[in-house]
From Swiss-Prot:
GO terms for molecular function: metal ion binding; RNA endonuclease activity. Pfam families: CRISPR_Cas2. Induction: Part of an operon going from at least MXAN_7266 to MXAN_7259 that includes a CRISPR operon with transcription continuing into the pre-crRNA locus. Its EC number is 3.1.-.-. The gene is cas2. Its cofactor is Mg(2+). It comes from Myxococcus xanthus (strain DK1622). Mg(2+) binds at residue 13. GO terms for biological process: defense response to virus; maintenance of CRISPR repeat elements. This is CRISPR-associated endoribonuclease Cas2. Gene3D superfamilies: 3.30.70.240. InterPro entries: CRISPR_associated_Cas2, Virulence_VapD/CRISPR_Cas2. NCBIfam families: cas2.
Length: 97
């Protein structure tokens, strides 16, 4: 049986433009870009830990990362203005290259 997936809101502040581009490119392989430094990702526990490890290799001590797990009720209460609001229960899988 496949591991259960959960929605995560991931936001970051990267001080160096070169590191920012590397982190941004990595996250594009895991989820959907919502705003400048904000992604939403549907991840298994294993995917989440792998992503955190990969991000730690690209980030510096002055950079910050926030990974917010969203329960089903939280996802239902997400409201957006002039942005996509659809958070499907079973999101399309992303292929990590």
């Amino acid at each position: 049986m496949a591991e259960p997936r959960r929605w995560y809101l991931i936001t970051y502040d990267i001080r160096d433009p070169k590191r920012w581009r590397k982190v941004h490119a990595l996250l594009k392989g895991y989820g959907e870009w919502l705003q400048l430094s904000v992604f939403r990702c549907s991840l298994t526990d294993r995917d989440r830990e792998k992503l955190r490890w990969e991000l730690s290799r690209r980030m510096d001590a002055v950079d910050t990362l926030l990974v917010i797990g969203l329960c089903g009720g939280c996802v239902e209460r997400v409201r957006a203005i002039n942005a996509k609001e659809d958070w499907p229960e079973e999101p399309a899988p992303f292929k990590v290259l």
